[in-house]
Amino acid sequence: MTKIIFMGTPDFSTTVLEMLIAEHDVIAVVTQPDRPVGRKRVMTPPPVKKVAMKYDLPVYQPEKLSGSEELEQLLQLDVDLIVTAAFGQLLPESLLALPKLGAINVHASLLPKYRGGAPIHQAIIDGEQETGITIMYMVKKLDAGNIISQQAIKIEENDNVGTMHDKLSVLGADLLKETLPSIIEGTNESVPQDDTQATFASNIRREDERISWNKPGRQVFNQIRGLSPWPVAYTTMDDTNLKIYDAELVETNKINEPGTIIETTKKAIIVATNDNEAVAIKDMQLAGKKRMLAANYLSGAQNILVGKKLI
């Protein structure tokens, strides 16, 4: 069986790892260190580590791979192939050169579009109607290696980061399973990326999460979809942060002051943007409160919201 080092961290990576364990010989798993999670800051292993532990696989968790003791240990292994999926670190050249068949990456976009750490988020934020999976050879430059295989998938109007993450995770494992035999047999072909067409999807920053209502409704709607259910777009109402998990677009008869609550219904808080498409907030969370449907919030506040300004 093909001896593989797998490198990945979040839930997206676990589907790929499970497939590799079933089909090949995974001799080591490399992932990020355990991190404190939640209000109580409980040290929690990354999802990939949990899968590796279930199968009693050796796990390496360097804070930074380059120059680490873990790297030296990995370089001693007899390995055929390195597979990465959302690992979160660049690989040093010494590790890229180690496996006989090279190092490949499962990336959640149609490269060269959306190189970087947040391709699913950015595709939705930008209003793309499709994205996909790319299997590519790894090089020193980020997400710039030759493309081995690609498969596209449609982004539906009601998709958000959560739903697309789950679809792409399955697609990534399936496409890798189809692609690996030709890589192992040495019969695959690969094509260089056109660097002139490259776009980038950097990790989401806190400032990217704040909603600017002085934009077209479609842009605000896509921002909400593209950040839900994590890290979640937010605005401010009465000096209190308000996270918005779900919304929809509604037509308005006139353009109102952006950010103004122009109407409430039984199920939504309708907020003006800078065009005639308003955003109807349906699922929300006020700072310090539990997440709730707008309908539940409105049962006690419907009559006092119209005219308020979100900033």
Swiss-Prot record:
UniProt keyword Repeat, yes or no: no
Keyword terms of this UniProt record: Protein biosynthesis, Transferase
Entry EC no(s): 2.1.2.9
Residues the entry annotates as binding (6S)-5,6,7,8-tetrahydrofolate: S109, L110, L111, P112
Superkingdom classification of source: Bacteria
Annotated function: Attaches a formyl group to the free amino group of methionyl-tRNA(fMet). The formyl group appears to play a dual role in the initiator identity of N-formylmethionyl-tRNA by promoting its recognition by IF2 and preventing the misappropriation of this tRNA by the elongation apparatus.
Protein name (database record): Methionyl-tRNA formyltransferase
Protein's UniProt keywords contain Transferase: yes
InterPro entries: Fmt (IPR005794), Formyl_trans_C (IPR005793), Formyl_trans_C_sf (IPR037022), Formyl_transf_N (IPR002376), Formyl_transf_N_sf (IPR036477), Formyl_transferase-like_C_sf (IPR011034), GART_AS (IPR001555), Met-tRNA-FMT_C (IPR044135)
Family classification: Belongs to the Fmt family.
Catalytic activity of the protein: L-methionyl-tRNA(fMet) + (6R)-10-formyltetrahydrofolate = N-formyl-L-methionyl-tRNA(fMet) + (6S)-5,6,7,8-tetrahydrofolate + H(+)
Annotated GO MF terms: methionyl-tRNA formyltransferase activity
Gene Ontology annotations for the cellular component aspect, listed alphabetically: cytosol
